[in-house]
Amino acid sequence: MIRPILMSFWTFGLASAPAALLPADWNAKAAGDEVMAALVNTTEPQVKGAHDAEMVIVKGKAYIVVEANDVQGGESAEWPFIYVTLSVVDVATLKVEKQQVFARSEQVFENVTLPVGACFVPRILQKDDQTLRIYFASEAPKKRQAQTWYLDYDLTTQSFENKLHKAYLKTASGTHEMQPQYFHADAAAQGFTRPAVDFGLYLFDSFKSFDGKLYVALNNYPGGQNALAVVNEARDTFEVLGHYNEPGTLKLTESAVNRLPDGTWMAICRQEGGNRNYTFTTSRDGRTWTVNEHKPWVPNGASSKPTFDQMKGLYWLGWQESTQINGVSRSVFNLDISEDGTNWERKYRFETEKSFQYPVFREYEGRIYLGVTQGDRDPSRKERIMFGVLE
């Protein structure tokens, strides 16, 4: 449920619900406005389109990876001119210190040359004290199988290695190159009926650690597939634990996942088509999942990436609202907090014609930082990545 804070809308459940986390007069929109006013642009001036950032924060620096292009606003896996780039931001001063493209179509590396195609949906992991590992998909829809690659970034020299390495997908049938065909085959063997596509397999909600293991939510956006995976110790193979795509009548994508206080897994899934509202599914073991269903604390979601994090001892659920500001898509984003994953309060409400979409949140030394896609002119508003302090 969402508690009746100022700017919060509905109450579900009984009067015996836990004590409120926020003051009765808390203004979620005012809090969101204050955050947005202090954001800084991390995108280079020549960039026309930028989207889907992820980041890690190490030794006072935010390392932000993003897909970008210098041709037009927006993004598409069918645009071979989309590349992936890294921005380094000092979190104390919010100053952008470095920007570097690390993979693009037909780029020549020491051990391989990338084929023609978009470099898409980058993800970043701190592998050890000296190394960041960055993953991305190389895609050319309807022409070849997409492949997920990775390369390492040395924190001491602040430089990328000049080699690419293939990531792998472990399924019930064995270990394969990380390509959509194997992800689909594993789901199909368990009754998944949507057709296979040759692109769209991404590391989506990443990376989350529980009981000494590292997990990630896998996604095939055009294929409507979702699964929980565990990452091996070498950080090069993703083992599918369980798929959560039911009911088959809904096309569900781009999930975010976390574990509740009793150990139950819970995922929130984006919905394409239908009423476009988010659905939720749970699992006791990460392998067998309940049929997705709507929950009352998300009454009017829109088709966009959700977030589901644990920060400062609370759960944080971020979701795109279907309400539009002056007709702008993805112009309202809610960020709710909870102690138990059931009783929710609205802490931030971001309303802007610049859009507020695909945010990423990271806790570092007692503060929470965010990166988010915004724009001014293109209808998609996928033009730049903003960075700043949430609280």
Locations of regions flagged by a protein language model:
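Bacterial N-terminal signal peptides
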Residues: 6-16
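Beta-rich carbohydrate-recognition and catalytic domains
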Residues: 21-48, 56-115, 125-254, 258-304, ...
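Active-site pocket scaffolds in enzymes
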Residues: 357-358
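Elongated alpha-helical scaffolds
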Residues: 117-119
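Hydrophobic alpha-helical segments
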Residues: 341, 364-367
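Positively charged n-region of N-terminal signal peptides that target proteins for export
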Residues: 1-4
